[in-house]
């Protein structure tokens, strides 16, 4: 993959050059930054990027992960045997729904292999959760310990990487946790599981406060992106940062904002080494991660 990076460097312009420059930033970050964030959106886990992300965590390229509930959903579903099949962006969604399929871009999955599988997994481990108050990173560890090493959560649990999910209720995992608590009321007299997101914030505060240098690879936008850069401001901003996105900045959205905008908020240092790659992550993330 490093040969491809060097080929991109020789192209000398446009996004190919940005990919080569991003590799340089990430390579230095892995060597110099003690806290290395990996932020990504859940949709990526519906693709084969799941294996690349798990491998990067397993190799300890990143030691803190911030993602969405959807990432957990897809990771668990795939671990439970769900088949995510190639399709088309132009499939008839009315027809798909009638046949019992979900569509995510040009990936399709049977409805019975998504929510029901996630719920089955969570409910199988309810008793380990009842009566506990858990941060999302603690929940992710408990779930990851029950999943194979080639999953994202499984790799993180074994590598000691903490996985934070600030929007934990926004997906099948969150709904399954609610069902888990419904069962607790009938079987355990109300000894429910509690998810304490402020405990996550306290842990992030300690991670950032105790860091010497902060780095982040941020793929996509939304809550997983903002949570990383929000906390970085309390240490003066990120020292190294690479964004990969196809969002535009002209609507003022967080997802489309470039690293330079974050400087005005104190979330990225003026001296930071930063690169923005305008590209589909499925095209460039495998190259970057395998080259490191």
UniProtKB/Swiss-Prot annotation:
It comes from the Archaea. This is Probable deoxyhypusine synthase. Keywords: Hypusine biosynthesis, NAD, Transferase. Its EC number is 2.5.1.46. Belongs to the deoxyhypusine synthase family. GO terms for cellular component: cytoplasm. Pathway: Protein modification; eIF5A hypusination. One of its GO terms (molecular function) is deoxyhypusine synthase activity.
């Amino acid at each position: 993959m490093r040969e491809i990076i060097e080929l991109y460097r020789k192209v000398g312009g446009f996004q190919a050059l940005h990919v080569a420059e991003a590799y340089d930033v990430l390579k230095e970050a892995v060597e110099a930054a003690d806290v290395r964030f990996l932020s990504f959106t859940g949709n990526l886990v519906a693709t084969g990027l799941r294996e690349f992300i798990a491998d990067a965590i397993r190799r300890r390229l990143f030691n803190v992960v911030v993602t969405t509930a959807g990432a957990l959903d897809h990771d668990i579903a795939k671990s439970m045997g769900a088949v995510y099949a190639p399709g088309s962006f132009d499939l008839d969604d009315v027809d798909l729904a009638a046949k019992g399929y979900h569509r995510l871009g040009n990936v399709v999955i049977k409805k019975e292999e998504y929510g029901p599988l996630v719920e089955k997994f969570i409910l199988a481990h309810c008793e380990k959760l009842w009566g506990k108050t858990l941060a999302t990173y603690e929940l992710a560890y408990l779930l990851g310990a029950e999943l194979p090493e080639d999953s994202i959560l499984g790799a993180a649990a074994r590598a000691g990487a903490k996985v934070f999910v600030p929007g934990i209720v926004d997906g099948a995992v969150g709904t399954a946790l609610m069902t888990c608590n419904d069962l607790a009321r009938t079987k355990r007299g109300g000894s429910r599981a509690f998810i304490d997101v402020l405990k996550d914030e306290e842990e992030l505060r300690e991670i950032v406060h105790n860091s010497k240098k902060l780095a982040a690879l941020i793929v996509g936008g939304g809550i997983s992106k903002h949570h990383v850069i929000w906390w970085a401001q309390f240490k003066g901003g990120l020292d190294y940062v690479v964004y990969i996105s196809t969002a535009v900045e002209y609507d003022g959205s967080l997802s489309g904002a470039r690293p330079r905008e974050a400087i005005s908020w104190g979330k990225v240092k003026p001296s930071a080494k930063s690169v923005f790659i305008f590209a589909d992550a499925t095209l460039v993330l495998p190259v970057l991660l395998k080259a490191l």
